[in-house]
Structures are given as structure tokens and as C-alpha cells.
A protein has these predicted regions:
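Extended alpha-helical scaffold regions
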Residues: 1-360
Length: 360
């Protein structure tokens, strides 16, 4: 395996490889914006995207290995000494911090012109006493930022690290990219989109929304509207089709939204309750479906439960008919899940049923 080392060298190959890749990335960022329209940019972008892919693969390997580490299979014996691993951790965090700066600068130049500028105030006609003209953007003449494989590779590597490494400082820095992340998510749903940023964006949001400021930034940049629109579209489509990839993305959306709901004070916003109404009107399919699709459907019901539980009694009384409809959905799903013998999903559904029944 690429990231294992059977030898006893002082600095094993995995350490040297990843360290070299990180050095290449850090040294490339300062001049990257100035090369956007150069003939060499395509090859530079491909090289750096590959470098980020190596970093992503290393982080993924490290996470999986630590999950299954045992006394006979210690990380120091298979991979590298703990002190070298600590150095790599610091180096990865430093590199990704620089990547955040680059992504911010690239996105501002391409789309906004100022950090976090609201979408309504971006590129468009500027009305002056001399007439209307369009505001400027500085970006590649050939490809938009949302079509650059380097941006996708960078976001993917950053996302995995944000979720797996509890580095609040880096998460705070990344929370400043929330407007960019939501724009990339939206662009991935457009017809003809060349790259799909949705899954990496959701993974990144898992990390940033662990902080209160990150969750607030998500809401400030229309994150709730964007994510719930996609979530409900997946739910509706699951009535007639069973896309496991779509269902997996829906589960990731719920992972982001439930902590946001639970953190909201003094309770769920009234606009959010549209999700409850939409789910209550959903038709449960009769056909047997893959386990991941059932898991997604249960996750949506858990989101509804979180919304209802975190609101005041007056709001709960207003939605009593929706609660009854959702409980009917719970009953139908339970009949299906019992047949696939998934005890964890059964327990989750019972929790949903118990909580919602107590709110009527």
C-alpha cells in the first residue's frame, strides 16, 4: 500500500511523499492567481489537483487505519513514528489554511469582489448617473471557478480534514468560505454542470457547523433554503426511484441540518416548518427499496422530529395535523424496515414515534 512502510527507515516513504506534496502546494499558492490565464495554467491546475488528491487519500487512509488500530497493528509499526505523524498533522493544517486563503481570493476575484458579499449584490448592472454598466470580475477567460478541477480537489481535501480533525481555528477560517461553498453547491445542480461539489461541501459543513459561528454563517448565506430544497427533492424522487447516491447525499444533508436546528434559540424558525409540512405530504412508496434509501427516509423523519421538538407549544399545536400525518408515515416505514431486519433503523423510528406522539 502507498501509505505503509515495512522498512525501519528514520523517515519512511509515506512521510517523505506527503511532506513533498504539501511543500509543493504551499509554494504554488502565492503565484497561482497570476497564472490563471497563462497557457501553463491547465497543467499547473492538474498537478495541484493531483497533489490535493494525494492529501485526501492520505487523510482517508489515516482515518480508516486509526479506526481499526490494534496492539498488533500499531500505527508506528505500519506507517511512521508518532512524532513524524504529528509533524505531518501540523503541515497539513498549515497547507489547508493557505488553501483557504487562496480559495477566498479566487472566489472573490471570480464572483464577488469582496469577502462574503451577498449574492444579490454581485455581478450585475451598476446604475450610475451616466447609465448602466456591468461590474467587473477577474477570473479565467476560459473556465469559471466552479469548473476548475483544482477547486474541487482543494475543497474535497479541506472538507475531510475539517470533519476529522477537531481544529477549531481552522474550522473558523473555513467558515469564512460558507458563501463560496453554497454557491458551489448551487452550481452543481445546474444543467450542464461539469463538476459536482455537493458531497464535499456537505462534508465541509459538518466541520464548520460544529462551531456556533459556522452554523450562523450557513444560515446567513441561505444554506437552509439551498439544502432543504435539495433534501425534499431527493425525498420526493425516492417515491418513484431508488438512487443510492442521492439518498447518501440526503443523509449528509440531515447530518448538517439537525445540529443547526438543535442549536437554534429560542426555537425552530417558523420558515423552517415548511419542511414539516412537505414531509407530512410525502407518499411512502410500496416497493422494496435499498437499505440506504430507507436510512435516508428515516433521517428525514428525525429532522422533522428535531424541528418539532425544538419549537414552542403553540407552534406544536398548529402543526398537530402534520404530526399525525408524519406518524402515519412512521408506521408505514416501520412495516418496510422490519422486513429488512435493520434493528438500528427500527430503534430510530421508535424514537421518532415516541417523541412525536408526546407532542400531540
Amino acid at each position: 500500500m502507498l501509505f505503509t512502510d515495512e522498512g525501519k527507515s528514520e523517515k519512511p516513504f509515506p512521510y517523505l511523499l506527503v511532506n513533498l506534496v504539501l511543500v509543493d502546494l504551499r509554494s504554488s499558492f502565492p503565484n497561482l492567481l497570476g497564472q490563471l490565464n497563462s497557457p501553463e495554467y491547465e497543467s499547473i491546475s492538474t498537478r495541484l489537483a493531483s497533489a490535493f488528491d494525494v492529501v485526501s487519500a492520505f487523510i482517508g487512509f489515516l482515518v480508516r487505519f486509526l479506526e481499526y488500530e490494534s496492539a498488533e497493528n500499531s500505527i508506528s509499526s505500519l506507517m511512521m513514528a508518532p512524532d513524524l505523524l504529528f509533524k505531518l498533522r501540523q503541515s497539513i493544517a498549515e497547507t489547508l489554511s493557505l488553501a483557504i486563503e487562496y480559495l477566498r481570493d479566487r472566489w472573490d476575484a471570480a464572483e464577488a469582489g469582496a469577502m462574503g458579499l451577498h449574492p444579490d449584490a454581485r455581478l450585475g448592472a451598476a446604475n450610475t448617473s451616466r447609465g448602466s454598466h456591468f461590474t467587473l470580475a477577474w477570473d479565467s477567460k476560459i473556465d469559471r471557478a466552479s469548473q476548475d478541477p483544482l477547486i474541487l480537489a482543494a475543497v474535497r481535501a479541506l472538507a475531510i480534514w475539517l470533519r476529522e480533525d477537531e481544529n477549531d481555528m481552522l474550522r473558523m477560517e473555513a467558515a469564512g468560505l460558507t458563501d463560496m461553498l453554497m454557491d458551489l453547491y448551487r452550481s452543481s445542480t445546474e444543467d450542464g454542470a461539469r463538476l459536482d461539489f455537493r458531497s464535499p461541501v456537505l462534508v465541509a459543513l459538518e466541520g464548520t457547523t460544529a462551531l456556533e459561528d459556522g452554523a450562523a454563517s450557513l444560515l446567513d448565506h441561505n444554506g437552509w433554503e439551498v439544502l432543504t430544497q435539495d433534501l425534499l427533492a431527493i425525498l420526493r424522487s425516492s417515491s418513484s426511484a431508488s438512487s443510492e447516491d442521492e439518498a447518501a447525499r440526503g443523509i449528509e444533508i440531515v447530518r448538517v441540518l439537525i445540529p443547526t436546528v438543535e442549536r437554534e434559540s429560542p426555537g425552530s424558525r417558523e420558515a423552517w416548518m415548511a419542511v414539516v409540512t412537505a414531509v407530512a405530504a410525502w407518499d411512502v412508496p410500496d416497493a422494496e427499496q435499498p437499505p440506504v434509501v430507507c436510512e435516508f427516509q428515516v433521517a428525514v423523519l428525525q429532522l422533522v422530529t428535531a424541528l418539532m421538538e425544538n419549537t414552542h407549544s403553540g407552534m406544536q399545536r398548529r402543526y398537530v395535523h402534520s404530526i399525525s400525518a408524519v406518524l402515519g408515515i412512521v408506521e408505514q416505514l416501520m412495516d418496510k424496515i422490519v422486513k429488512i431486519h435493520d434493528e438500528a433503523l427500527e430503534d430510530s423510528l421508535r424514537d421518532v414515534e415516541s417523541t412525536l406522539s408526546g407532542l400531540r
